[in-house]
Every structure is written in structure tokens, then in C-alpha cells.
Amino acid sequence: MISKLKMPQPSVNIGMVGHVDHGKSTLTLALTGTKTDTHSEEIKRGISIKLGYADTPIYRCYDSSGNVHYTREKGENCDLERVISIVDAPGHETLMATMLSGSALMNGALLVIAANEHCPQPQTREHLTALEIMGIKNIIIVQNKIDLVTRERAIESYREIKNFVKGSIAENAPIIPVSAYHSTNIDALFEAIEKYIPSPKFNENDDPIMYIARSFDINRPGTPVSELKGGVIGGSLTQGEFALGDEIEIVPGIQTTKGNKTVWNNVTTEVVSLMAGKYSYDRIRPGGLAAIGTKLDPFLTKGDAFTGRIAGHVGKVPPVAFSMRLESHLLKRVVGSDQELNVEPIRPKETLMFTVATANTVGVVNAMKGSEIEVSLKYPVAAFNGMRVAIGRRVMNRWRLIGYGIIQSLE
């Protein structure tokens, strides 16, 4: 039986970002005690492919002399500060779209940079640019793998990091040296998280909106039909609350064919369970990551099929858009590539990738007027006017980040 209300719900989502193999998943394990790369292909290849999630409490503890230290383990003379959710984003260049969709959930970020490699590596640069584009300002730089380098190299690495972030959103971010593998200096990192990444304030009286980042079928093969559980959606509420028994609507829903036409039907279902981490709740609020058990056929939700959708109360969800008008803002240079490439202007009829909250879709530029572009989408999205959208372009067989847009209108 899952215990109720043993721990408060997480109050903040913190992204774990950086270049592949710089130790993000190991650092997540050191912070939370949880491995996030449990997908079979991830274990085989040793990299994160999907977004990983883990929650951890942070305790403020006092020793007999009154000195303070921070930890996830509750001991004597310890006060619970809060619970945080870690979003472990893949660092591999082919998985940039997954990292971008995860950034929609982040209230702050840990940018992991390995001391034993020159800084910046391609995805270090790309992920920092993504944080800038998505407006994530609360950043801590984690200088990892200090156990693998000399003192001189650690200092040289620190200087490389300072030069790299100069003039960026992370120019004044603290740099915390750690060894994630040996859990060295993790207490200092917890202290920095408490100081530099505050829990955002949300309006819990608004209609609930949840960005869906994962969806699952939790039934084991061979489960009797009478014991099957409904599909599960996972993500983060950005406003409002969900309670047990709520009727919810999921948009864009399910794609069906009517004659020669493709039709998208919104899905409605009932909330039958609410979980954050390993605890169940009667209601969930914004702040951390949560999983909602529903009465949906689990076949519909298996394998992240509902990723990129939005859930809300019935009739209170955003419209489904098949086209959008954006005010575009392009970077000077393509990021993530080993070569220095300038970003060329967007062209009419060009195909681009758009990350709208947790949804990744492809669209064709139909019309342009100055920096304003009109795009028809291959797959529709649920969105709001004023949302920030990441724009990617195919460069040398990879989707590369080239800028962002602000949604002006949706159709």
C-alpha cells in the first residue's frame, strides 16, 4: 500500500542539462538516490534517451556546534526545506528535441560540465543556448569529475567555464565543483540549489493546465483483463489543481481517419490516482512532476504516445492549432555543430522543427512578413498566444537550434 502524504509534493522542477557523458545521470543518482536511465536501450548504450525524473527531499541539518549542512538523508536536528523534482535531459546531439521539450517543465537548471574535457563541448553550448531561449534564468553550473583531474586542470577548467558563460544568461551563475561518482561536495550543491533556485509561485485558483511529458502502460504482460489499470500520463501542472475524480480533457487527443480526412478527437477521462514520486495524493498542485492514473485504455498511452499534449478540466483546455503565426528571433550562429555556421534567414516553403511546450512538431513556412512567419504544422499542437517556441532547422542531417518564436495567433 502506498503511504499517503508522507512527504510534501515537489515544489520545483530542476533540469539536469549538459553534454553527453558529462555525468548528468550519475549526478541525478547522487542527488536523489534514483537511477533515471532505466529504459532498456539507455542501459545498453549508456546514455539517456528519454526524459528521466526523480524526486528528492532537501534537509537543512545542524551539528552540535550549530554549523549547517544540507542533505537528502533525514538525521537528528534536521528540518525539511522542500522536495524537488529533477528532470534529467539527454545530452546526445540527436536527442536535442527531447531536451527542448523537457525545458518547458524546468524552473531552473543544473548545467553539468566535466572538468576532464575542454569547455565548451558542442551540446554544452547548445543546452546553454536552449536555457536562454526558453527563458530559464536560475542556473547553477556543476563542474563534475573533479576526481579525475589534477588541481591545476580543475582551475584551468574553471577558467574555461567562466570564459564560456561570459555575456550569457549564466554569466553570474555559481560554479560548484563535485564528483558525482563519489558523491563529493553534494552537500554544497544542495545548499546552492536552496539559495539560487527558488520554488516558483503558482496560482492554484486558475483552471488546471498540465504539460504531458511522458505516458505509460503500467500493466505487466499477462495481467488478467479484470486487473488491468488504465493509462498513466506524467508531466507538470503549471497552474491550478487536479483532484481525484476530476473529469479531464486531453488535447490534441487521438488521430483518426474519416473518409479521406485526418481528424483529431480530444480525449476525456477520469482521474483515478495522483502520484508524485512514490507517494499518492488526493490532489496535486503545480511545482514538481506528477503522474495521473486515468480510465484510458492503456494501449493509447503506452510508449509515451501522449507526450506533447496538454491536460485540463473538460472544456477548459487550449485550442488545437494546425497553423500558427510567430514573431521569430534568430540566433547569429547555429549551435550544437562542431563547425561555426551562421544562421541563414528563414525561407518561404522551408520545413522547420518547432518545440511548443513538451510537443515537437514539424511545419512548413507558408508566408513571411519581416520577422513574422506563418507556419502550417504536420502535427497539430495545443498552445496559447504569447508562448515561447524553440525553432530548429535541419543542418547536416541533424535538427539544430536556430532561434525562437513568440506565438502571435493560432488556427
Swiss-Prot record:
InterPro entries assigned to the protein according to its UniProt record, in alphabetical order: eIF2G, eIF2g_C, eIF2g_dom_2, eIF2g_GTP-bd, P-loop_NTPase, Small_GTP-bd, T_Tr_GTP-bd_dom, TIF2_gsu
A GO CC term assigned to this protein in UniProt: cytosol
Any matching Pfam family: eIF2_C
Region annotation (G5) ranges: 179-181
Naturally occurring in which organism (per UniProt): Thermoplasma acidophilum (strain ATCC 25905 / DSM 1728 / JCM 9062 / NBRC 15155 / AMRC-C165)
Record bears the keyword Hydrolase: yes
Chain spans, region G1: 18-25
Chain residues that bind GTP: 21-26, 144-147, 179-181
Organism domain of life: Archaea
Binding-site residues, Mg(2+) 1: 25, 48
Entry coiled-coil feature ranges: none
Catalytic activity: GTP + H2O = GDP + phosphate + H(+)
Positions of the UniProt region annotated as G3: 88-91
Binding-site list for Mg(2+) 2: 21, 46
Family (UniProt): Belongs to the TRAFAC class translation factor GTPase superfamily. Classic translation factor GTPase family. EIF2G subfamily.
Keywords: GTP-binding, Hydrolase, Initiation factor, Magnesium, Metal-binding, Nucleotide-binding, Protein biosynthesis
GO biological process: formation of translation preinitiation complex
Self-association and partners: Heterotrimer composed of an alpha, a beta and a gamma chain.
KW Ribonucleoprotein (keyword) present: no
Gene: eif2g
Alphabetized SUPFAM superfamilies for the sequence: EF-Tu/eEF-1alpha/eIF2-gamma C-terminal domain, P-loop containing nucleoside triphosphate hydrolases, Translation proteins
tr-type G domain: residues covered: 9-201
Region described as G4: 144-147
Any one GO MF annotation of this record: translation initiation factor activity
Designated name of the protein: Translation initiation factor 2 subunit gamma
Cofactor: Mg(2+)
Enzyme class: hydrolase
